[in-house]
């Protein structure tokens, strides 16, 4: 079942190249607030579609339209994640302050971070299936019931699998691109060659890899939610 979800998500992310390009542009400029909000607003739309989908179906990524609603959805998406992550983030920062590491506080922060990520990952599809209600994203007891119906062990393994697959793909592509950039620097041994090579590397990572992995992850979120 879980492997089928991964397979579906990989295929889904590659069915509409034009969307990858649009998301790539937004990803490239995501240091700016507005492009980032639209980026996450579209990802929310993918989650919502996926909660209504069958595994190994033939859905394609949704249209990039209704920008006003997409922007609002993006704000909700970001707000939900920030709210879930703010407490563990503060604890982790405090554990690293004063020039030393408080190991106990750091461990507590990392455990809370994992728990927050597990809940926030289901909070988005739960919100999408409850009338886009922001309040529903914080119905922790209800989200916990969904998690329990999926199976705690299966859900945690699925989530960690998504992270592992995403990180592995990113690292492999990063290493391959680094090798290509090194060859480019040897062929064009100037400061301009180094700049061009690094720029092309960032271009591939932000225009192709980042949007592809974001579609993969959000598609998985909606499909895993459906198991519950």
Q: Across the structure, where does each feature detected by a protein language model lie?
A:
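Juxtamembrane/interface motifs at transmembrane-helix termini
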Residues: 93-94, 165-166, 174-179
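Membrane-helix interfacial "entry" motifs
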Residues: 58-73, 98, 102, 106, ...
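Low-complexity, intrinsically disordered extramembrane tails and loops of integral membrane proteins
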Residues: 1, 7-8, 55-58
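Interfacial aromatic "cap" segments that immediately flank transmembrane helices
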Residues: 3-29, 64-90, 118-171, 218-219, ...
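Selected alpha-helical membrane-embedding segments in polytopic membrane proteins
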Residues: 36-61, 65-97
């Amino acid at each position: 079942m879980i492997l089928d979800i991964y397979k579906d998500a990989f295929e889904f992310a590659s069915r509409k190249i034009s969307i990858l390009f649009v998301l790539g542009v937004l990803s490239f400029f995501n240091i700016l607030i507005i492009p980032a909000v639209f980026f996450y607003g579209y990802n929310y739309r993918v989650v919502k579609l996926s909660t209504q989908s069958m595994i190994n179906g033939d859905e394609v990524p949704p249209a990039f339209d209704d920008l006003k609603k997409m922007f609002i959805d993006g704000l909700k998406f970001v707000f939900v994640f920030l709210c879930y992550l703010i407490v563990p983030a503060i604890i982790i920062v405090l554990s690293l302050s004063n020039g030393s590491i408080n190991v106990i506080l750091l461990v507590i922060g990392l455990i809370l971070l994992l728990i927050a990520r597990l809940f926030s990952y289901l909070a988005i599809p739960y919100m999408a299936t409850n009338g886009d209600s922001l309040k529903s994203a914080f119905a922790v007891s209800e989200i916990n019931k969904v998690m329990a119906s999926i199976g705690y062990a299966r859900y945690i393994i699925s989530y960690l699998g998504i992270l592992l697959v995403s990180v592995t793909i990113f690292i492999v592509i990063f290493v391959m691109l680094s090798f290509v950039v090194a060859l480019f620097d040897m062929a064009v041994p100037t400061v301009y060659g180094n700049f061009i090579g690094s720029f092309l590397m960032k271009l591939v990572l932000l225009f192709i890899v980042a949007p592809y992995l974001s579609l993969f992850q959000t598609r998985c979120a909606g499909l895993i939610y459906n198991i519950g």
